[in-house]
């Protein structure tokens, strides 16, 4: 099973942790985005959208990290796997957290941080305030249960761990958020592959403007 990825990418790391939790060995293929590796013809044949992560499982190509995470559990996980249980309400809550992470939390971070290294712009305090609103939302969600979507580790925790560790790696302090801090300490100890996730997150430091 080929996995095209970049360690500093939070979406890639969320898939790596999912595979680790399921005991799946991935054939990791480092794709050097900053050198245009994603635009090479051989990769475009696999993924014309030229994004990572991309998984190829016996000829079946799939991209978008949350889609890959769900696919891996549904194909290789246990029946009613706790990572993504079969109960519609439990799945719905996990999905809500996954979409929140992708479309609100990490997007808020990207809006604030990416212009600083892509366009060499100074940090925008207003964009940071908007990002803090998304952290407030996450803090509220995490006040309701032990983990992100209930009392056991799920795909939601793995995706959110990849994001929050990225924030920490680029010196964004989440310790002032009581429930995020409690949850973050917990998942760093309980999420399979958390150490590899942190090592990848630290590569984000290379993007911090000097």
From Swiss-Prot:
MF (Gene Ontology): glutathione transferase activity
Binding site for glutathione: 9, 50-52, 64-66
Catalytic activity: RX + glutathione = an S-substituted glutathione + a halide anion + H(+)
GO biological processes: glutathione metabolic process
EC identifiers of the protein: 2.5.1.18
GST N-terminal domain: residues covered: 1-80
Residue ranges of coiled coil: none
UniProt-listed Gene3D superfamilies: 1.20.1050.10, Glutaredoxin
Annotated InterPro entries: Glutathione-S-Trfase_C-like, Glutathione-S-Trfase_C_sf, Glutathione_S-Trfase, Glutathione_S-Trfase_N, GST_C, Thioredoxin-like_sf
Assigned keywords, A-Z: Transferase
PROSITE patterns per UniProt: GST_CTER, GST_NTER
Pfam families: GST_C, GST_N_3
Location of the GST C-terminal domain: 87-208
Record-linked PANTHER family: GLUTATHIONE S TRANSFERASE D10, ISOFORM A-RELATED
Subunit structure: Homodimer.
Protein family (similarity comment): Belongs to the GST superfamily. Theta family.
Protein function: Conjugation of reduced glutathione to a wide number of exogenous and endogenous hydrophobic electrophiles.
Protein name: Glutathione S-transferase 4
């Amino acid at each position: 099973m080929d996995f095209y990825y970049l360690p500093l990418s939070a979406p890639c790391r969320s898939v790596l942790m999912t595979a680790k939790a399921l005991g799946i060995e991935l054939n990791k293929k480092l794709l050097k985005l900053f050198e245009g590796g994603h635009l090479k013809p051989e990769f475009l044949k696999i993924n014309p959208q030229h994004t990572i992560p991309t998984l190829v499982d016996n000829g079946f190509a799939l991209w978008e990290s949350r889609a890959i995470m769900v696919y891996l559990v549904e194909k290789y996980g246990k029946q009613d796997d706790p990572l993504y249980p079969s109960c519609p309400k439990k799945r719905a809550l996990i999905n809500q957290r996954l979409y929140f992470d992708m479309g609100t939390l990490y997007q808020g971070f990207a809006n604030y941080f990416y212009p600083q290294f892509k366009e060499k712009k100074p940090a925008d305090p207003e964009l940071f305030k908007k990002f803090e609103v998304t952290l407030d939302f996450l803090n509220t969600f995490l006040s309701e249960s032990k983990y992100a979507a209930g009392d056991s580790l799920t795909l939601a925790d793995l995706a959110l761990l990849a994001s929050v560790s990225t924030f920490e790696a680029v010196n964004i302090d989440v310790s002032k958020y009581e429930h995020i801090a409690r949850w973050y300490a917990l998942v760093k100890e309980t999420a399979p592959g958390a150490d590899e996730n942190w090592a990848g997150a630290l590569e984000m430091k290379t993007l911090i403007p000097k």
